[in-house]
Amino acid sequence: MLSFFFLGVCEGWGDPHYITFDGLYYSYQGNCTYILMEEVTAKYHLKIYVDNVFCDPTEDVSCPRSLTIAYGFQVITLINHNLIGAPKLEALQNGERLKLPYSQQSIKVMSSGINLIYEIPRLNVVITFGMTGFAVNLPYKYFGNNTQGHCGTCTNNQADDCRLPTGELVGNCAVMADYWPANDIYQPNCPTPPVVPTNVPEPPLEPTPCTPDSSCDLLKSSVFAECHPLVSPENFYKGCVFDSCHLSNPIVECTSLQAYAAACAQAGICIHWRNHTKVCASDCPPDKVYKPCGPAEQATCEDNPNEQITTFVTEGCFCPDGMKLFNKESGICVEKCGCLDPEGIPREFNERFEYKCQDCICDEPTKTVICKPKTCPAPPTANCTAPGFIVVNQTSSVDPCCFVYVCKCQINTCPVNSMNCPVGYKPVVSVPEGKCCPEHTCEPKRVCVHKDVEYQAQFQSSCK
């Protein structure tokens, strides 16, 4: 008898490989948007679409580019904009990017840096999406015997997983998958399957000899040995071998390992596997650390102890041990809770600091930064008695937030001197160092003067 609390997991990864809710493995290379899961009888109004696109330049193999989740009146798309290298993940609603974490109308959307996590807390539904592909976790309590699509029927019976929209069963889920296009989405380039399905036996994974990459062997090695009794690695190994032999991008092989590690994590076994590979390294920002099993909803300074948080674990980039997020929006890790200043720098409670010529404090009662204009000491009065100097205030060289009084030369306030020099002399204007106003002096010219008349002096001659 199936447990009332049984959790069905449908997984898809690589190019892509599927494991249905009931554990049936198959591969499918469709290049359209399909119904991944829908309710046979609408009870909770949950429907999930998967958009598969060709993702290799040398082979017609496809990868899951996005999941679109329709729940009630909300439609949210989890998308990976980069299928070749490091994932570039976004959550969209009505074409607009969601600021994560998002929590509204009974759903949550979070990011671990490596995966996006979509949760419906009241139904215990958790959906993850990332470079690895996706995993849809549904409780049998709400969805048992009431699902159809690429993920199968959630009946704990693999024999009825390959069901067509008509209810007819076929023996090959890769054939079945053709019949689940998202008809309510305009897709002019999607092929129309034949009216009567043909049960073509699945071809062997590799018709010609192929040596898979050594990364695939890790799945059956001691690295994952602790998980083997709980989750079989066989389907993930088959997917890894197929990807290794068909795709030119070696990073895709990582998806099988990542998908298996995620399945192990949900079974309670955390595997540190990435450091055993050459091409599956994690990439976290400098202020975060990689963890193979961390909380999908990370602890913050703003957590309400009475509020239920997600217990789902995922790999990703997390705050170092002993630190937590300041809040859900900032993404900043702190050792002690306090305030964020206007520049986003964490401040401890009662810490005083200066910001843009304001004296600020991280106020503990309000948990906010309170600022007031900085109080400057009264500057000494400048004694400007010399001609031309006036008193002005200017920014202090010691403290740019305060001002001082200085004597500044204002030449247009200087007295006007009309100086007449005697015959044979010329007026010379200069401003002595330390003074403002020009001073006039009379200097002799190189001329001869006779009866108040100037004469040009001749070389080696004398004036008589």
Residue ranges and their predicted role:
Residues 1-464:
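Extracellular/secreted glycoprotein ectodomains characterized by long, lumenal stretches
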